[in-house]
Structure formats: structure tokens, C-alpha cells
Amino acid sequence: MEKVTFYGEIEGISLEQMVRYGKFDMRVKHFHNQYEIFYIIEGERLFFFNNREYVARSGDLILVDTNLIHMTKSVTAEDTGHNRVILYVSYDRMKAFDGQYPSLQLVRFFHEHYGVYHLDKEQQALFLNFYRNLRIAMTEKAHNYKVGIDLETLTWLFKITSYVSKQEGASPHSSDHPKYRTA
């Protein structure tokens, strides 16, 4: 069972929070033409990309490049569920951000730095505050809220690019399943 606790969107940016109860495995690998920023509030997930699996836990941030084949599944058969937030940014919107602020090189950043990142407590609070601010803006739709969403998103992307550039992503998890072993 699953429950979408929030969904909001503007052109090129969408935000979703979902709680899943119990074990959940995606049945097929997939890709999309959006950048995916996946944050785990509670629980844990196995992420698969580039024929490797990574364990992501509460407080972890997962960056998924556009058109990157990926999927997630439960870590164990006894999985009790997870609570996650996903921010999707379209390729066109990311290119527009790059056009406004070329030194950020966001398209290049996602291409080079997709993966699982373990955030410290301050960075976790930063993401949750970012999520809260976007959620409020998308719900209340106050004057110039779309500009506010762009500014919040750019500020957060600026901060995360600095952090990720200094940290290595998580190492692949050793799988017992022969289908997912790395070569």
C-alpha cells in the first residue's frame, strides 16, 4: 500500500512525497527525461544503476541523471516500508538554469555525479527545509511563487553541488543475488 502525501508542480519542476507501507520492489528498470533527486526520510532502499546496487538509508540523497536506467527495491523481505521525497527537474528546465548561471554547469554535474550520498544532520535539515519551502510555495501559490520555487531550487542545487563535489558517492553494495553482482 502507498500514500502520496504531497504532489505539486510548476513547468519543469515537480515534487512528490510518498509513503509506502511494507515491501515494495519495482518490477522493471526504467529511465525518464528528467533529473531525479530522491531523498529518504525513513526506511531504506536498494538502488540499481550501471549494473551495480547501492543501499540508501534514511537521510541519504540519491541523484539520478536524465535517461539513466535505474530501479529500486526493498533491502530485505521484512521491509516495513519507506517515506521518500522526489524532486523531478526536466532537462529543459535544467538547461535553462545553466543558461542563467553557466558556471553552475548543472547538466554536467548530474551526468558526472549521479549516485547515493550520505548527508550529515545539517545537510539533512537543509534538504527538509528546502522541501518544506517548495511544498508551501506550491500549496499557497502566493504572488511570484514560481520565481520563489526557481530561487529555492537554484539555491539548493548550488549548495548540493558544492557538497557532492567534495564527497565521494556510496560504494556499491555486494549482492548475494547473481543477477545483480558487479563484474
Regions found by a protein language model. Give the residues of each.
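Hydrophobic packing residues in well-ordered alpha-helices of helical domains and bundles
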Residues: R84, F127, K146-I149, T153, ...
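A hydrophobic/aromatic-rich effector-binding and dimerization subdomain
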Residues: E2-L15, I69, K73-I136, S162-K166
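Broad gene-expression machinery/nucleic-acid interaction feature
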Residues: E36, N83-I86, T182
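Generic protein-terminus/edge-of-domain signal
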Residues: M1-L61, L68, L104, G115
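Short hydrophobic-aromatic micro-motifs
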Residues: I62-V64, L87-Y88
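Short, flexible, glycine/charge-rich loop motifs used to bind or transfer phosphoryl groups or to couple energy/partner
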Residues: R27-V28, R52, V75-A77, H173
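Short, Lys/Arg-enriched, Trp-marked, Pro/Gly-tolerant hinge/linker segments that flank
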Residues: H113-E122, M138-I149, F158-A183
